[in-house]
Amino acid sequence: MKMEADVVIVGTGVGGLFSALSLPRDQKIIMITKSDLESSDSFLAQGGICMLHDKDDYDSYFEDTMKAGHYENRKESVDLMIRSSREIIHDLIGYGVDFQKQEADESGNEAADNGGETAAIQDIYAFTREGAHSRPRILFHADITGKEITSKLLAQVKQLSNVTLLEYTTMSDIIVENDECRGIIAQDKDGNEFEIHAENTIWASGGIGGRYKHSTNFPHLTGDALTISEKHGIRLEHLDYVQIHPTTLYSKKPGRRFLISESVRGEGAVLLNSKKERFVNELLPRDVVTKAIREEMEKEGTDHVWLSMEKLGKETIMGHFPNIYQHCLEEGYDVTKECIPVVPAQHYFMGGVWVDSDSKTSMEHL
């Protein structure tokens, strides 16, 4: 079988969906995903999404980002991310994403919202804080922000007549003609191979968590684009830059680790050792907190540390972190009354396929 498209997008998470929505409507687009449409890590994200408050926030936002990246970040990319963040958030709201709004003020009046015509986003929505940020600049939807964003984008894409969505379809290779990418070779769930020819190919295929025993990722995310890149000499970068999230719920059960969002620490949750003593500033960058946890575990001879959310209060926990509360309850922990055991696990892949500031790889049309 052979399919034709203007653009083929590998991956149906936030990156792939936003790309599809941003392309011209006269472009024929085919999107594929290895599993079902909702089994992408984008659906699992809990904490939120960062946004530049105003021009006065730029310098601290830039410095926070560079510091967290040990000043190895590509400055051009950091600048682009920060300066485009307000426009991206505006687009997401336009697609129906419902971020948490500010509570009513003392007079009982809620922040005005008429589509952003007269009120700025920062005057309407509530912001929380996460590690490495010097101020709250994260927009959120309870503790299921990823699900809120991705489900709304997916609903929008499903309405597009120019987009075809293929589930349970795996990219096994790319089609290369004259050193240019001209589409992909794919396999359906029965192992039948077919070609998707396209003028341009977009990889939005996720991370590498499936290669790890302990990860917060779905197991089918195995870094397929890396293997294909190595085969065709496509430039890769920083393959050793793998982020370990400090706090996942400790369990002896096999399978994906359940993430305990960094936002709980942003709201005041604290990390404790076996003696119930604090041992680290919980809002330091993730790699620093992870290192402190591992050192504490080694020093004490334990396989986890403890996280206390009790000081947040039941109202905040139930309102901001209902999913975490419910999952922990199912595992036998009431986070409103007791500490929970947490352990670091593989979470995010910061290396991968090299791209320029326009997200073009070293191969044309990819």
Regions found by a protein language model. Give the residues of each.
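Short beta-strand to alpha-helix junction loop
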Residues: 75-86, 136-155, 166, 215-223, ...
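Core beta-strand elements of the Rossmann-like FAD/NAD(P) dinucleotide-binding domain
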Residues: 2-5, 190-200, 362-363
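Conserved redox-cofactor binding core of oxidoreductases
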Residues: 93-192, 204, 248-251, 257, ...
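Glycine-rich active-site loop/strand segments that organize a redox cofactor
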Residues: 50-81
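Short FAD-binding loop at a beta-strand-to-alpha-helix junction that anchors the flavin cofactor
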Residues: 200, 204-206, 358-366
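An anion/pyrophosphate-binding glycine-rich loop and adjacent beta-alpha core
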Residues: 37, 228, 234-346
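N-terminal Rossmann-like FAD-binding beta1-loop-alpha1 element of flavoenzymes
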Residues: 7-31
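Glycine-rich FAD pyrophosphate-binding loop
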Residues: 24-45
